[in-house]
């Protein structure tokens, strides 16, 4: 007869939560050790698989984000905001279309992230173009100025939004206008340079009856001003305008004043574009703006205020850049070097170009040389130049 003890199969109970193995029947010590080791190995495998899942979820093994060099992406009117250790580059869809504004960031001005939207216009804003976005830090917030264009509004239109008005010609004798469309400078606010930006009002801050574009911010004696262009399409000869603003930048507090007109120097065209103001430490208030010059095409001009105030008078209109590029702005690199940013060529293949600027007693020195190449490059602070700006 077979011994009774062999009719029973030992039962092994494993309690994983207590990290122990309970043997219901006696087994040799070597068997218990083997089983316990297998349990520990299984736990380690499960823990490793769980950790791997978490790491993949967090993107540790994801491909690094793509960066772009300046010659790899199209952009018009490139506006750079240095903030902290980061440069912010704002852009809209070039030429026409678009429903908002995007930003790219960089640490070195050579390599830029992919663009992220910082402004999405409300669905009921039926614009046809978004132009020339720029962001200014003022009164503890970030303010985005951009130009919106709309389809023409008929005088008897009943379904047009209240912020759109018919545009009537205001042509000077001897000048021809262009296509008359509602166009104005809208202002948006955010707590961060990366948005989201929200409108300070529904509609343009510039007069609704005027075709206006390219608004920029200048603060003088604590008062914010908008400098903007009254379009040549409506006036014939483009006008550079300025108006003081309310503290929340939602309205003008006085009627706009005229600073100068496009055809203010020999050979100049009738376009006023892209004003930007700066006051170097040892000289007066200066402005750069864009027009067309005979024999040069689209260009950047510079001028200076005789009084040192925004109201001018403005004089010494001279070329700064004359190689079919324009709508410039000036910013200070992290090392203090002043830089000119513009788009070039003035076509649908435009790219952002950067040039170091030198300041002399008579204005910014010409910068018609080739743009900075790839990689870090520094321009020495030579005689007659300044790094600091107010």
Where in this protein do the model-derived segments appear?
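Short stretches within intrinsically disordered, low-complexity N-terminal or propeptide regions
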Residues: 17-18, 30, 192
């Amino acid at each position: 007869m077979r011994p009774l003890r062999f009719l029973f199969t030992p039962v092994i109970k494993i309690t994983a939560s207590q990290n122990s193995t309970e043997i219901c029947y006696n087994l040799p010590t070597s068997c218990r050790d083997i089983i316990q080791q297998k349990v520990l190995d299984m736990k380690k495998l499960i823990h490793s698989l769980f950790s791997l899942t978490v790491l993949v979820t967090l993107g540790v093994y994801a491909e690094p984000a793509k960066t772009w060099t300046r010659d790899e992406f199209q952009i018009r009117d490139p506006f750079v905001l240095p903030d902290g250790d980061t440069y912010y580059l704002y852009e809209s869809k070039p030429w026409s279309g678009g429903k908002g504004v995007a930003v790219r960031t960089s640490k070195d001005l050579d390599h830029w992230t992919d663009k992220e939207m910082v402004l999405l216009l409300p669905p009921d804003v039926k614009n046809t173009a978004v132009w020339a976005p720029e962001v200014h830090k003022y009164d503890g917030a970030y303010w985005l100025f951009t130009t919106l264009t709309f389809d023409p509004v008929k005088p008897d239109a009943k379904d047009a939004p209240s912020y759109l008005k018919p545009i009537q010609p205001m042509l000077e004798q001897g000048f021809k206008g262009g296509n008359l469309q509602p166009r104005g400078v809208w202002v948006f606010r955010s707590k961060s340079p990366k948005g989201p930006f929200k409108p300070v009002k529904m509609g343009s801050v510039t007069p609704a009856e005027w075709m206006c574009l390219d608004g920029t911010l200048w603060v003088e004696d604590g008062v914010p001003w908008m400098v903007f262009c009254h379009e040549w399409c409506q006036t014939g000869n483009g006008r550079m305008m300025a108006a003081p603003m309310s503290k929340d930048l939602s309205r003008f507090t006085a009627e706009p004043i005229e600073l100068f007109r496009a055809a203010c120097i020999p050979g100049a065209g009738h376009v006023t574009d892209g004003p930007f103001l700066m006051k170097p430490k040892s000289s007066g208030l200066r402005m750069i703006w864009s027009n067309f010059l005979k024999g040069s095409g689209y260009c950047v001009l510079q001028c200076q205020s005789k009084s040192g105030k925004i109201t001018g008078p403005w004089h010494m209109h001279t070329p700064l850049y004359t190689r079919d590029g324009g709508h410039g702005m000036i910013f200070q690199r992290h090392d203090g070097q002043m830089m000119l940013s513009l788009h070039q060529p003035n076509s649908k293949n435009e790219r952002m170009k950067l040039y170091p600027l030198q300041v002399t007693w008579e204005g910014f020195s010409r910068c018609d040389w080739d743009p900075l190449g790839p990689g870090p490059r520094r321009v020495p602070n030579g005689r007659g130049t300044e790094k600091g700006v107010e």
